[in-house]
UniProtKB/Swiss-Prot annotation:
Keyword Nucleotide-binding included in the entry's annotation: yes
Organism: Methanococcus aeolicus (strain ATCC BAA-1280 / DSM 17508 / OCM 812 / Nankai-3)
Protein name per its UniProtKB record: Type-2 serine--tRNA ligase
Gene for this chain: serS
Database matches in CDD domains: Gly_His_Pro_Ser_Thr_tRS_core
Pathway annotation from the record: Aminoacyl-tRNA biosynthesis; selenocysteinyl-tRNA(Sec) biosynthesis; L-seryl-tRNA(Sec) from L-serine and tRNA(Sec): step 1/1
Alphabetical keyword list: Aminoacyl-tRNA synthetase, ATP-binding, Cytoplasm, Ligase, Metal-binding, Nucleotide-binding, Protein biosynthesis, Zinc
């Protein structure tokens, strides 16, 4: 790497000739910039190429290689200069400013894959002939340097370079971590009966009035028949899977502070997949203007509403297990007394963009979430049990399924690099899918159970420790109620008489849809 800096140290008053002599003495002392540089790497250290005095400013041109980088050098000069001139000349340093700072980083291959790379706080230039990327900072001061934005930008770019494989495609952290190739099928079950139903369950649900599209994107109103079926599956999953493993029920918050998502590193991986929440300002007078304009114009004045909202401070829970890790934030635990919690208290939210179509991929969905914390062996065992009992339930219902190694564990999704010393499991995620026979072009399934082990990912992020300093892992399993129902209806259809006794016993008598003249449309 090459670093070239043009900046200045700004003093509290004009620099006198005597002060200049003392400052020059400091600038000529190479030991200041060689401190900490390994023997034999002196040429990589910072060098002051040029300097000049102008009023109360010391203008510097500094170059360096990897060691004692130029931006570190200008900060390093501050203390010895002050020791030399502070008391004697009664002057202080007011600020450090970098007017222009160019950092050239070598990229071994496929530099064109970074063509659209954007780095916050700086500009980028690609040189495809030399396979280098240059990041350029302009007009940054002491406060930015103290926040280490330069080092973070360098680290960010180097990570992006490392993530570009020989093919020029981005590498995914999931594929790097997995001991078994993602999408490998590890178990499957073929239905014993002949599955003849082949209609789209979303379309049929709408025709029958079991659901109605809500005005929000990816949202549905579930009417009594669909709700009855959802609750039946909720009971079955609790009885046949979760209670057998001994989870204790909790009520998890669903409004999650952004700082929790930051510690989870969810904001790195899938920031575009969440609903962000902005609390309102508590100013009745300002809202009175909003209401008045709405009543006069007979429309919602969105522009005015934006001004009445604070910055986003929360997200609607996209993973459901977020509060579990915050609960243990910086706590001492005992892995001899592991924890198993389950939450089924409300909706989960994902922004799917254009990916939301039918009932199998929605923005607002119900699921049962189990979470466990303990020794690695315990966490793996519990995860495997949740999957085993889910598969057994599907077999009891004669639902055709397969289980595969997941290619998108939620805590790794969208992430390209892990710079911390994290322990990962051999398989971060198993995904169980129910077959959708109405999809003709391919053998497609709906993911109904996602069984995850996180290793030390969340333990590290939330500072959780065992009181004997033993290894602590976490894991979670999500049972998607809506998706279990869709997979069931896709294979059995909507005729109650064709359903298995296990389901009919839970439901009893099916309720009717509300009588509305204009709905459902025939």
């Amino acid at each position: 790497m090459k670093f070239e800096l043009n900046g200045k140290i700004i003093f509290s008053k004009e620099i006198t000739d005597d002060a200049k002599k003392d400052i020059i003495e400091v600038l000529n002392d190479r030991t200041i910039l060689l401190k900490g540089v390994p023997t034999g790497k002196e040429e990589e250290a910072s060098k002051i190429v040029n300097y000049e005095f102008k009023g109360n400013e010391l203008i510097l041109n500094i170059i360096s290689g990897t060691y004692a980088r130029a931006h570190e050098a200008i900060i390093r000069l501050k203390k010895p200069i002050m020791e030399k001139v502070g008391k004697i000349h009664k002057m202080g340093i007011r600020d450090i400013k970098i007017d222009n700072y160019e950092i050239t980083i070598n990229a071994p291959h496929n530099i064109d894959a970074l063509e659209n790379l954007k780095v916050p706080e700086c500009e980028t230039e690609l040189n495809e002939e030399e396979n280098t990327i240059k990041i350029i900072f302009k007009n940054i001061g002491d406060s930015e340097l103290k926040r280490n934005i330069v080092d973070r930008a360098i680290k960010f770019v180097k990570t992006e370079i490392d993530n570009i494989g020989d093919s020029g495609e981005e590498c995914d952290l999931t594929y790097e971590v997995c001991g078994i190739a993602p999408n490998t099928i590890v178990s499957e079950y073929k239905a014993e009966r002949t599955i003849s139903y082949n209609k789209d369950p979303t379309e049929e649900s709408e025709k029958l009035g079991w659901v109605k599209r809500f005005s929000g994107k990816g949202q549905w109103f579930y009417t009594p028949p669909m709700t009855k079926l959802l609750r039946a599956f909720e009971e079955l999953l609790m009885e046949e899977c979760i209670n057998k493993i001994g989870f204790d029920e909790c009520l998890f918050p669903k409004l999650i502070p952004l700082e929790v998502m930051y510690k989870m590193r969810y904001l790195e991986g899938l920031p575009e997949g969440m609903y962000y929440v902005s609390p309102p300002k508590r100013d009745p007078e300002m809202f009175k203007e909003f209401v008045n304009e709405m009543m006069i114009k007979n429309e919602i004045p969105i522009h005015k509403l934006k001004d009445l909202l604070r910055n986003p401070g929360y997200v609607l829970a996209p993973a459901q297990c977020e509060p579990f890790y915050q609960f243990f934030d910086h706590e001492l635990v005992d892995i001899d007394n592991p924890v198993k919690f389950v939450d089924k208290s409300g909706w989960t939210y994902r922004w799917e963009g254009g990916g939301s179509k039918g009932l199998d991929r929605v923005h607002e969905f119900l699921r049962i979430e189990t979470v466990q914390m303990g020794a690695p062996e315990f966490v793996n065992s519990v995860r495997d049990d949740t999957l085993k009992y889910a598969e057994k339930l599907a077999e009891k219902l004669d639902l055709e399924y397969w289980t595969e190694v997941g290619d998108d564990p939620f805590y790794l999704e969208g992430r390209k690099k892990e710079e911390r010393n994290i322990e990962f499991p051999e398989v971060p995620k198993y995904e169980m899918r129910l077959w959708l026979p109405h999809v003709k072009d391919e053998r497609k399934g709906v993911a109904v159970t996602s069984a995850n082990v996180h290793g030390t990912h969340f333990v590290e992020g939330f500072g959780v420790k065992d009181y004997k300093n033993r290894t602590v892992w976490t894991g979670c399993t999500g049972f998607g109620l809506s998706r279990w129902v869709i997979g069931f209806l896709a294979q059995y259809g909507f005729d109650y008489n064709d359903w298995p006794e296990l389901i009919k016993d839970k439901i009893g008598e099916m309720p009717n849809i509300p009588k509305v003249i204009t709905w459902p449309k025939k």
